[in-house]
Every structure is written in structure tokens, then in C-alpha cells.
Design a protein with these regions (language model features):
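Conserved glycine-rich Rossmann-like NAD(P)H-binding loop of the short-chain dehydrogenase/reductase
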Residues: 33-52
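Conserved Rossmann-fold cofactor-binding substructure of NAD(P)-dependent oxidoreductases
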Residues: 69-88
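Conserved mid-core alpha-helix of short-chain dehydrogenase/reductase
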Residues: 74-77, 125-132
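C-terminal helical subdomain
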Residues: 200, 212-251
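Rossmann-fold scaffold of SDR-type NAD(P)-dependent oxidoreductases
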Residues: 18, 90-99, 122, 151, ...
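Rossmann-fold cofactor-recognition segment
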Residues: 57-73
Length: 251
């Protein structure tokens, strides 16, 4: 996505980031807003009234959008709100960041609802949200030649690099991220002719509520790299899997 080749995009790039109220999502909002070529950042959160840190960002290019990915009505309203702002320009980037991690203990009976929760948010909600924004992505692709979906995945979703479960019982999370990677691959093929690309990115082990403070990366270290990586994506990276440093990952 070489912006120099598309002068019409300068100061008009629109980016939607889900799960933007904290952690990696919040960090991505801050980092992407540092790019002067970005015109609008739509930061989605389940509950806008509780997104206090997000609300403290004073940049007028950022628009907070309330969206619960598990609610069809909420997703519909969010897309309508974004559409009102972007009009005929569409959405250039959709960053599916919202996610949960609910572990299971193999030494106890497994609760089906805990396993399902990982899939509901990490897979199903992402599919629903991506499809809902398809029209706006297609609009941008028709105007500029391409649009980009970015799925924030995890190395724990890599089947090739799996080392079994962990003491924290991450298997359901790993399964959901492996499924998300399949979604990335299929979207990259199914929407290729429309100019819509899709790529998975592993953000690293990050110091968030999910990752814990013992993690090796700060939010800024991870998201500053991801923000640069996102704008490097092009037709050669469609349907592939990278880490925050833009190194290729194995499925």
C-alpha cells in the first residue's frame, strides 16, 4: 500500500479499529493517528461511556463508535455511523483487533461456554463485522484500487509452531486464532477480484490485560511496529501471516 503512488489518498485514508478502548487497540489508535496521511480513525468499543482513555485522545480525526461485535444490531448501527462520515470514499483499512482469551483447565470438566466465548469474539464476531463493512471496503477499493482488512491474530494460532497447551490453558484461544487465520486466507481469495486484501498479524506478547505485565513487549513497541506494517501491505502480502516486525509467520 505505497501511499506515494496514490496522492489522492493523502489526508483521506480512513481506518476502522475494533476493540479500541484499551490495550493493543488503543495503542493502534494512537500510533495510526501519528500518520499525517490518515484522515479518519474510527475507534470502536463495546461501551463508549467507559472508554475513558480513548476519550482523552483529542485528535479531531478520531471518532469513537460504539459497537458490540456480538450484536448484529450494534454492528449495523456502527457501519451506518461510519458510512455517514466517509460517504463515497469508503473505508480503506479495517483492523479487526477485538478479542478475548478465556482459558480452560484440562484437570477439570471443560465448560462449553468458555470455549465458545473464544470463538464468538475472536472468530464469529470478526466474520460478522468484516462482512458488514464489505460495502464500505468495496467502495474504497473501487476508488483507490484496493482496500485492506487486517486481522490481529496470534502465534498461538500457528499450527506449524504449536508447542501444545500452556499452563494457562490457552487451547481454546489458540483454536480460535487458527480459525481466524483460515478466515484471513479465505477472504483474501474470495474478495481478491474486488481489490480487497486480507492479512493476519501477530502483535507479539504484549503487556496488556490479556498478555500480563510479564510480557516482553510494551503496547507502544508492538503497535508502533504494527502501524508501520499495516501501511506496507500490498498485493504480495494478501492472504499471508506476519508478526509485528513484518516477519513472515508459519500457519
Amino acid at each position: 500500500f505505497n501511499l506515494c503512488l496514490f496522492p489522492s489518498l493523502i489526508m483521506s485514508i480512513s481506518v476502522v479499529i475494533t476493540g479500541a478502548n484499551r490495550g493493543i487497540g488503543l495503542g493502534l489508535v494512537r500510533e495510526i493517528l501519528k500518520n499525517p496521511q490518515v484522515g479518519k480513525v474510527f475507534a470502536t468499543t463495546r461501551n463508549a461511556s467507559k472508554a475513558t482513555e480513548l476519550a482523552m485522545i483529542s485528535d479531531p480525526r478520531m471518532i469513537i463508535v460504539q459497537m458490540d461485535g456480538e450484536s448484529d444490531e450494534s454492528v449495523k448501527k456502527a457501519v451506518e455511523q461510519v458510512a455517514e462520515h466517509v460517504g463515497s470514499s469508503g473505508v480503506d483499512f479495517l483492523v479487526n483487533n477485538a478479542g478475548v482469551l478465556i482459558g480452560v483447565d484440562y484437570n477439570k470438566p471443560i465448560k462449553r461456554e468458555d470455549v465458545a466465548a473464544n470463538f464468538n469474539v475472536n472468530c464469529i464476531a470478526t466474520m460478522v463485522v468484516t462482512q458488514a463493512f464489505h460495502g464500505l471496503l468495496e467502495t474504497a477499493a473501487k476508488k483507490n484500487g484496493h482496500a485492506q482488512v487486517v486481522n490481529i491474530s496470534s502465534d498461538l494460532g500457528s499450527i506449524a509452531d504449536s508447542h501444545g497447551s500452556t499452563p494457562r490453558g490457552f487451547t481454546p484461544y489458540s483454536m480460535s486464532k487458527a480459525a481466524l487465520n483460515m478466515f484471513t486466507r479465505n477472504v483474501s481469495l474470495d474478495w481478491k477480484d474486488e481489490g480487497i486484501r486480507c492479512t493476519s498479524i501477530h502483535p507479539g506478547w504484549v503487556q496488556t490485560d490479556m498478555g500480563g505485565q510479564e510480557a516482553s513487549l510494551t503496547v507502544e513497541e508492538s503497535t508502533s511496529n504494527i502501524a508501520h506494517t499495516i501501511f506496507k501491505l500490498d498485493e504480495t502480502t494478501n492472504g499471508l501471516f506476519y508478526n509485528w516486525k513484518f516477519d513472515a509467520m508459519r500457519w
